[in-house]
């Protein structure tokens, strides 16, 4: 399985870089996982609704340019479906079983995802109702993908 994670902004925090690198190394035994960063749109601290939409649209265009046409796209969105780790693992396994070898996860910037990206996605998932920094979501996502492969293979880790 080829898994791509398209995310907005450059990761700067050393502890997150190290954590993600560790999980990417572990995931190498199960899948090819790549992270694609697109530049975030510079914006003032306080934005009108129209300005927020404009920022999300610009970031969204950058995201869409990185998604392969044949990818199954999973958007991480606060309004997405919440799943247990076991459900997430089963869903990833089903994608592989039904020939969806390219899976792209999308993590938006601090304002979220554009409507165009959400429309392009095949599904939306949420890791909870909490608002988390989008940089931290990268680490949470790669850990959950790793956990999913371990669960599917019946390997110890997920308890």
Curated annotation (Swiss-Prot):
One of its GO terms (cellular component) is cytoplasm. It is an enzyme of class 2 (transferase). It is found in: Cytoplasm. S-adenosyl-L-methionine binds at residues 76, 108, 127-132. InterPro entries: Alpha/beta_knot_MTases, RlmH-like, tRNA_m1G_MTases_N. It catalyses: pseudouridine(1915) in 23S rRNA + S-adenosyl-L-methionine = N(3)-methylpseudouridine(1915) in 23S rRNA + S-adenosyl-L-homocysteine + H(+). The keyword Transferase applies. Its EC number is 2.1.1.177. GO terms for molecular function: rRNA (pseudouridine-N3-)-methyltransferase activity. Keywords: Cytoplasm, Methyltransferase, rRNA processing, S-adenosyl-L-methionine, Transferase. Its main location: cytoplasm. Pfam families: SPOUT_MTase (PF02590). Specifically methylates the pseudouridine at position 1915 (m3Psi1915) in 23S rRNA. PANTHER family: METHYLTRANSFERASE, RIBOSOMAL RNA LARGE SUBUNIT METHYLTRANSFERASE H. Belongs to the RNA methyltransferase RlmH family. Homodimer. This is Ribosomal RNA large subunit methyltransferase H.
């Amino acid at each position: 399985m080829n898994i791509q994670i398209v995310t907005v902004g450059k990761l700067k925090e050393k502890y997150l870089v190290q954590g993600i690198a560790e999980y990417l190394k572990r995931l190498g035994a199960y899948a090819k996982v790549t992270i694609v960063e697109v530049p975030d749109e510079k914006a003032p601290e306080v934005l009108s609704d129209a300005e927020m939409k404009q920022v999300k649209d610009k970031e969204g265009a950058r995201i869409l340019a990185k998604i392969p046409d044949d990818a199954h796209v999973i958007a991480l969105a606060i309004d997405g479906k919440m799943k247990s780790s076991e459900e997430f693992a089963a869903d990833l396994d089903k994608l592989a079983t039904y020939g969806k070898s390219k899976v792209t996860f999308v993590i938006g910037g601090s304002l979220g995802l554009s409507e165009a990206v959400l429309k392009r996605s095949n599904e939306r998932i949420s890791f909870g109702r909490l608002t988390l920094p989008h940089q931290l979501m990268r680490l949470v996502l790669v850990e959950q993908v790793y956990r999913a492969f371990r669960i599917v293979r019946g390997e110890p880790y997920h308890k």
